[in-house]
Amino acid sequence: MKDFDTIAAISTVLGEGGISIIRISGDKSLAIVNKLFKAKNGKDILDMKPYTMKYGHIIEQDTKNILDEVLISYMKAPRSFTAEDTVEINCHGGVTPTKKIFQEVIKAGVRVAEPGEFTKRAFLNGRIDLTQAEAVIDIIRSKTELSMKSAVSQSIGKVSEEINVLRENLIETIAHIEATVDYPEEDLEEITSSQVQEKIEKIIEELERLLDTSEEGKIIREGLDVVIVGKPNVGKSSLLNALLSEKRAIVTEIPGTTRDVIEEYINLDGIPIKIIDTAGIRETEDLVEKIGVERSKEKINEADLVILVLDSSNKLNDEDYEIIEYIKDKKYITLLNKSDLESKINKSDLEDLKLYNIIEISAKMGFGLEDLKEYIKDLFFKGDIQTDSIIITNTRHKEALIRAKESCNTALKALENTLAIDLASIDIKNAWLSLGEITGDTLEEDIIDKIFSEFCLGK
């Protein structure tokens, strides 16, 4: 275990609640808290048994007044989250008592932890690898049960297991090649170019299998940005309200009622989807509405999917044509809204405009919403969403897998010349190094620091 100073942070959200937790980690954590804590039985906590709790009070050192009634828990190294001695103070929830106790802890000789520093110590002390560390923040940020399940799978080492098997196969191959090249006089089983090629091809197959999950995995982790667009008063806000099953957007007969972007999340069979209702796109002299239109265009450019809403009870006009032209290069679904009314849109017109993925709906009556949801899933997922197998959800992991695959392919090219078997080992080692970046075994320190800096305080 590495030699670190003692750190502390408030691990729960500041606000009113049942309890707040202040976490202290480091070899001085128990001694520091002992200065502030007075147990109900009058004993200090230096002889406290690990994995137990003690009841008492935190005492303000300057005034000797009781600050709060608390429970102290103690986890002894290396069997703690950070693999260091760790003490947690459980006090009453609330901003004032939590801050006052935290101030006393810092005054007693503890450094304020940086964002993600507890998890970083768990990684540096060897309790978890980098994929497991990243999974911690993914669990915290998960928006659906499916995204949480995927993050939990990563947190218990499922991704690491697959990566480590691949790395082990690569390093064994390197060892065989180098032994054959460096010690030809020894009585060693010689590895041939074709044998190495067969091993590398199998590894490439495994890399491709993992990479095939990455697009769906990214969506499970980060969700989809879905933008609703259309001219004013075609039913965009009604669609948003119908998808949310609540009245989130104002619905009136007055064009331009939605003047800004409205964003809400929905859970689509475990997929977190951010639905973005935009201001109607049209030419306007109203300054506020004009700003809303510009924001709408920005959201369209950033979107994973655009839902184009057309009013089927009215003929298409220049405003519709302008929007259709603007989104033609995006992935989109066309909704013919107000299907409960007589349709005045000619299907042949839609064919001429090369519009596709057309669904008839009535946002007001609720018709066609399930068809829309199924269409979204079909556009981004190949069949049913698999939750039991390993899914690559992290872009950093995907990029490392791509580099590993490229190195393996370069090794195969080198092996086409049977005399260049030793040259292939260089590329195989590069693949091994790339996979090590995923688990953190071969990653640069500054990149590791950047990853943990994105964590929240207290974690």
UniProtKB/Swiss-Prot annotation:
It is found in: Cytoplasm. Residues 223-381 form the TrmE-type G domain. It is an enzyme of class 3 (hydrolase). Its EC number is 3.6.-.-. Its cofactor is K(+). (6S)-5-formyl-5,6,7,8-tetrahydrofolate binds at R23, E88, R127, K459. One of its GO terms (biological process) is tRNA wobble uridine modification. GTP binds at residues 233-238, 252-258, 277-280. Binds 1 potassium ion per subunit. Homodimer. Heterotetramer of two MnmE and two MnmG subunits. This is tRNA modification GTPase MnmE. Belongs to the TRAFAC class TrmE-Era-EngA-EngB-Septin-like GTPase superfamily. TrmE GTPase family. Gene3D superfamilies: P-loop containing nucleotide triphosphate hydrolases (3.40.50.300), Probable tRNA modification gtpase trme, domain 1 (3.30.1360.120), tRNA modification GTPase MnmE domain 2 (1.20.120.430). CDD domains: trmE, TrmE_N. Keywords: Cytoplasm, GTP-binding, Hydrolase, Magnesium, Metal-binding, Nucleotide-binding, Potassium, tRNA processing. Mg(2+) binds at S237, T258. Its main location: cytoplasm. One of its GO terms (molecular function) is GTP binding.
